[in-house]
């Protein structure tokens, strides 16, 4: 039964598909479902407060279906990204319909691109990590892995953590500070990692060099094959995904008690 609940992630591409193939109010269906209907539904559903037993936890960890479901999000995300490049060019779309479709893709960038990419990036397996990297690339947030694993977990809830909100910090300032500071710190983490292993910061194993080049190649490739409008639409969707992530970080992190926060 639990794997079936895990498949509820498929609600997202179904709803976004309706947005991509509709006009009018339905183009905003992803926002309506995930920011209104589901939160409203949660008010009437009692949460399950029971934890798994140790035996159940061991059994679930050995069940590969969960990993396969995560793997399955990769072709879904890439497929919808390609579909997005096509439907965003549809003739006759109003500005509000364009916003609805961009926001729908942005939700996919956040939930599948960043969230699932983050989960796979935590695993000590190169295949899992690579799939996570590709998913994060679709959201232009590849620096998330080195920073999150090498910085956030080490410094969470302290002034050193870019992703920890400062006391009374304005949300718009948090978006900017958290994202760009974590990007800079990701470079520092990679440089220190290579330095400690006796390698130059410009070594080919510097993930931030690879990630930055891949981000630029993706943006440039979209511009070359689809044009400026599609590129801007993709950037808008990716930024939407990043903002949704940063907003979650803001409201789930505790402000550090340090006087500088």
Ranges and model annotations:
Residues 32-50, 110-113:
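Central hydrophobic cores of alpha-helical transmembrane segments in multi-pass inner-membrane proteins
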Residues 9-12, 73-81, 210-219:
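Core segments of transmembrane alpha-helices
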Residues 54-73:
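Juxtamembrane helix-capping/reentrant segments at transmembrane boundaries
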Residues 95-100, 108, 112-136:
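Membrane-interface helix-loop-helix junctions at boundaries between adjacent transmembrane segments
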Residues 251-258:
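Conserved small/polar residues in nucleotide/adenosyl-binding loops
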Residues 127-194, 259:
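Membrane-proximal soluble regions of multi-pass membrane proteins
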Residues 46-51, 79-96, 116-119:
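Transmembrane alpha-helix boundary signature
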Residues 15-28:
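Short, hydrophobic transmembrane alpha-helix segments
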């Amino acid at each position: 039964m639990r794997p079936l609940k895990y498949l509820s992630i498929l609600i997202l591409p179904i709803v976004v598909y309706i947005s991509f193939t509709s006009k009018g109010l339905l183009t905003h269906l992803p926002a309506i479902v995930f920011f209104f209907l589901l939160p409203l539904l949660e008010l009437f559903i009692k949460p399950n407060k029971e934890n798994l037993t140790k035996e159940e936890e061991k059994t679930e960890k050995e069940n590969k279906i969960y990993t396969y479901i995560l793997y399955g999000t990769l072709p879904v995300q890439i497929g919808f990204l390609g579909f997005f490049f096509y439907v965003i060019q549809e003739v006759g779309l109003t500005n509000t319909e364009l916003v609805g479709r961009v926001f729908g893709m942005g939700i996919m960038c956040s939930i599948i691109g960043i969230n699932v990419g983050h989960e796979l990036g935590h695993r000590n397996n190169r295949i899992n990590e690579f799939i996570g990297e590709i998913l994060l690339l679709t959201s232009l947030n590849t620096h998330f892995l080195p920073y999150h694993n090498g910085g956030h977990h080490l410094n969470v809830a302290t002034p050193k953590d870019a992703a920890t909100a400062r006391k009374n910090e304005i949300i718009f300032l948090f978006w900017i500070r958290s994202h760009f500071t974590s990007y800079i710190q990701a470079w520092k983490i990679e440089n220190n990692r290579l330095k400690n292993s006796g390698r130059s910061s410009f070594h080919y194993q510097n993930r931030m060099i690879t990630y930055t080049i891949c981000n630029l190649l993706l943006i440039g490739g979209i511009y070359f094959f689809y044009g400026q409008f599609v590129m801007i639409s993709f950037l808008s969707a990716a930024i939407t995904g990043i903002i949704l992530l940063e907003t979650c970080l803001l409201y789930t992190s505790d402000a550090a008690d340090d006087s500088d926060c």
